Amino acid sequence: MLITLEGLDGSGKTTVWEALHDVYPDATFTREPTDSWYGEAVDRSIAADDADPLAELFLLTADHADHLSGTIEPALADGDLVISDRYSDSRFAYQAATLAASDVDIDRPLEYIKGIHAAFSRPPDATIYLDLDAREAAERAGRTNKFEQDGYLAAVRKNYERLIDAEPDRFVRIDASQSPEAVIARVEEVLSELLGE
């Protein structure tokens, strides 16, 4: 089973992901961007305010393709539980906001990006969405890069809402404004239900 953790920067995904290592020690834990050379290129692009939005999208997509073939698919084939800190929904939400705010002439960026992935990507079995207001997310994240600004995160949050509306049965929304301990406890409950424990 592939479980993904999604939400705005600052929502606590990584904190939850790290806490789950103790609860599911035999699971395969992974994240996007990865630590491969593709992921390193993504990190460089994210840090650059002048990165071309289409080039950045395709760097992220290349990292995802490599992640699928090198980590996700082999782990699933072995029957592992896979828990990923970010996955394709991050790309849909974030890069659609980036493209919409750019000079790139794409009418429906979210649908465009989903279309690129449809040919090769594997959707998650379930997605835990850590929901947090854009302003609070930006404050928590520290506003250290172009993806951590209030206005941008508000657009990203709207894209996440569109994704949830399109597939409500796949997403489980958790209020991330609670304490980290409360969020972690709720995620553990949700995972237990999803895994039939």
Swiss-Prot record:
This is Probable thymidylate kinase. It catalyses: dTMP + ATP = dTDP + ADP. It comes from the Archaea. The lineage of its organism: Archaea, Methanobacteriati, Methanobacteriota, Stenosarchaea group, Halobacteria. It holds the Pfam family Thymidylate_kin. Keywords: ATP-binding, Kinase, Nucleotide biosynthesis, Nucleotide-binding, Transferase. InterPro entries: P-loop_NTPase, Thymidylate_kin-like_dom, Thymidylate_kinase. SUPFAM superfamilies: P-loop containing nucleoside triphosphate hydrolases (SSF52540). It is an enzyme of class 2 (transferase). GO terms for cellular component: cytoplasm. GO terms for biological process: dTDP biosynthetic process; dTTP biosynthetic process; dUDP biosynthetic process. Its EC number is 2.7.4.9. Belongs to the thymidylate kinase family. The keyword Nucleotide-binding applies.
